[in-house]
């Protein structure tokens, strides 16, 4: 069975209550549930992990390599603009990944315009809200079939 890992970065545990005008009203639990359902329907095992700690996300990426995860969907959140270490972990395991952002990072503060991940990602989806996760998953399902 093919396996996908969804990684959520810092503060995404607050989705649904954190700045809903930017991030929407869906909770992380709702987003994960929708993704798991979609993957189950396609016969793919999907697991989700959220952490506010960079080291825990790096360890999850390392474990994904050991677990032979086929694909990663990652919303690095604020680590998008700061974490060379998380980027290096993704490069080290060589698992293809899609970078997802709920908001359009290019329409926000200038410090959010740079991503340490985009140039090594298979693709980037930004600004489509929670649909971005689903679109990433649908693209991966088509690729894995």
Curated annotation (Swiss-Prot):
Record-annotated active site: 23, 101
EC number(s) from the headed UniProt entry: 4.2.1.10
Residues the record marks as site: Transition state stabilizer: 18
MF terms in GO: 3-dehydroquinate dehydratase activity
Catalytic activity: 3-dehydroquinate = 3-dehydroshikimate + H2O
Biological process according to GO: amino acid biosynthetic process; aromatic amino acid family biosynthetic process; chorismate biosynthetic process; quinate catabolic process
Coiled-coil portions: none
Alphabetized SUPFAM superfamilies for the sequence: Type II 3-dehydroquinate dehydratase
A Pfam cross-reference name: DHquinase_II
Record's keyword terms, sorted: Amino-acid biosynthesis, Aromatic amino acid biosynthesis, Lyase
EC category: lyase
Binding site for substrate: 75, 81, 88, 102-103, 112
Pathway where it operates: Metabolic intermediate biosynthesis; chorismate biosynthesis; chorismate from D-erythrose 4-phosphate and phosphoenolpyruvate: step 3/7
Subunit annotation: Homododecamer.
Function: Catalyzes a trans-dehydration via an enolate intermediate.
Family: Belongs to the type-II 3-dehydroquinase family.
UniProt-recorded name of the protein: 3-dehydroquinate dehydratase
Organism of derivation: Legionella pneumophila subsp. pneumophila (strain Philadelphia 1 / ATCC 33152 / DSM 7513)
Lineage: Bacteria, Pseudomonadati, Pseudomonadota, Gammaproteobacteria, Legionellales
């Amino acid at each position: 069975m093919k396996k996908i890992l969804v990684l959520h970065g810092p503060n995404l545990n607050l989705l649904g209550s954190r700045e809903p005008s930017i991030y929407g009203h869906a909770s992380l639990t709702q987003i994960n549930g929708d993704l798991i359902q979609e993957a189950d329907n396609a016969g793919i095992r999907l697991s989700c992990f959220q952490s506010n700690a960079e080291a825990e996300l790096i360890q999850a990426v390392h474990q994904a390599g050991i677990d032979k995860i086929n694909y990663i969907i990652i919303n690095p959140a604020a680590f998008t603009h700061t974490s060379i270490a998380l980027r290096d972990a993704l490069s080290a395991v060589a698992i293809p990944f899609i970078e997802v952002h709920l908001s359009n990072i290019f329409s926000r503060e200038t410090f959010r315009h740079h991503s340490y991940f985009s140039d090594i990602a298979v693709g980037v989806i930004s600004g489509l809200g929670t649909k971005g996760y689903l679109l990433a998953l649908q693209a991966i399902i088509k690729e894995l079939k």
